[in-house]
Amino acid sequence: MHTTHIILVNLEYAELNQESEIIHYAENATDVFQHDAFDWRTVQDVIIGSNKPDELLNLLEQCLDTQQQQITQYLKVLNNNLGDSLYQIVSTLSNDNTFTLEFNELAKLLAGEYTFESGFFDIEYCTSRIDKDILQAVKEAPENYALVLFDYHN
């Protein structure tokens, strides 16, 4: 199985200028996730905010939308099958682990744990969770950011 992962690099924070430096930095920062997020990977593209600010913002907004859709989907499954309170959900899961996977995946998304399913990683904040604050910072100064797109295989 393979999927595209988008790695956000703050160029000011890392003091990077060349595309090759950006790729190397993104690889080094995510190497620790080998076997959790990927078995092997290849670079697909590098999008530098000063060159393509609209594309950079568009990809980040797509990541945010995807994450929100995933969270909503897991919540619907849990709500429809286990109830609408955390107490009900945990009580039911204690006796019947049928929906433990969905609960676990939801928790990983909310906690920003980087996995194969995440699709996104922010190196500066060491999180797979993209939120409106990160998006706003990139909107205000896209020239300070780059995205490295990897084809992850698992």
What name fits each language-model region?
Residues 1, 111-154:
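Acidic, proline/glycine-rich low-complexity IDRs
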